[in-house]
Amino acid sequence: MKQSFSRPHFENQELDSLKIGEKIFNSRLMVGTGKYNNLKEAIKSIDYSGANIVTVAIRRAQNSKNLGRSNLLDGLDWSKLWILPNTAGCESAEEAVRIAALGREIVKKLGQTDNNFIKLEVIPDSHYLFPDPIGTLKAAEYLVKKGFIVMPYIGADPVLAKQLENIGCATVMPLASPIGSGQGLKNLLNLKIIIENSNIPVIIDAGIGTPSEAAKVMEMGASGVLVNTAIARAPNSPQMAKAMSLAVKSGRLTHTAGRMIINQTANPSSPIFGISK
């Protein structure tokens, strides 16, 4: 049975919903939980974003818990948000599989007993943080067989994106530019190819620095956007979260409305006939 997941206070926009697995979400903006100055700022920003899906690094959350520190797993109301555990910090497929299993247990303890989502990250490169395509494919294939709803973070590689779709991944999440860099849309052609060739949702993840960039990929036909650093590192994080929310909605509406045809000549909007001179 399909389940709908939305915030009670979500504005009733004329937006089609986003389906991932058997879950339906009203917001196409997903947000992260890292790099905020404090928990209060993070919670306020997540609220302002209007996001349904919030991703949490399982390794970081577990370390905070072991040290007795407060973290967003305790601070957020998970009856109103859908947690997307991620395998950030994993350098191999085997490590990612172990962390994914831990993540599934954690979300069940938070009350989301039907949550099998995992944002798969396999990143052996500590400098540029580019994901390992071979390790990602290997881990994804195993996790899909184990019943996970796999959402892999990948480079902007159309061939890999299609392979991940073919083995049963629920989405693909190609980067726009290096994670946390704010460099913006450096792979537009490849992103466009991935979007055009995909039969599953394409969520643009990493590198987006401004709302205009989020709107641009949504106009291209992306299914959604995941933003963390651009919000968390903004001087006014809650305000930037709201701006990203509006940009994603605007971009999606633009895509579904359709762009006007570009003309090579001018075309006046006011009539030039029938007016006395």
UniProtKB/Swiss-Prot annotation:
It is found in: Plastid, Chloroplast. Keywords: Chloroplast, Plastid, Schiff base, Thiamine biosynthesis, Transferase. InterPro entries: Aldolase_TIM, Thiazole_synthase_ThiG, ThiG. Its EC number is 2.8.1.10. 1-deoxy-D-xylulose 5-phosphate binds at G180, A206, G207, N228, T229. The active site is at K119 (schiff-base intermediate with dxp). GO terms for cellular component: chloroplast. One of its GO terms (molecular function) is thiazole synthase activity. It is an enzyme of class 2 (transferase). GO terms for biological process: thiamine diphosphate biosynthetic process. Pathway: Cofactor biosynthesis; thiamine diphosphate biosynthesis. It catalyses: [ThiS sulfur-carrier protein]-C-terminal-Gly-aminoethanethioate + 2-iminoacetate + 1-deoxy-D-xylulose 5-phosphate = [ThiS sulfur-carrier protein]-C-terminal Gly-Gly + 2-[(2R,5Z)-2-carboxy-4-methylthiazol-5(2H)-ylidene]ethyl phosphate + 2 H2O + H(+). It holds the Pfam family ThiG. Catalyzes the rearrangement of 1-deoxy-D-xylulose 5-phosphate (DXP) to produce the thiazole phosphate moiety of thiamine. Sulfur is provided by the thiocarboxylate moiety of the carrier protein ThiS. In vitro, sulfur can be provided by H(2)S. Belongs to the ThiG family. PANTHER family: THIAZOLE SYNTHASE. Homotetramer. Forms heterodimers with either ThiH or ThiS. This is Thiazole synthase.
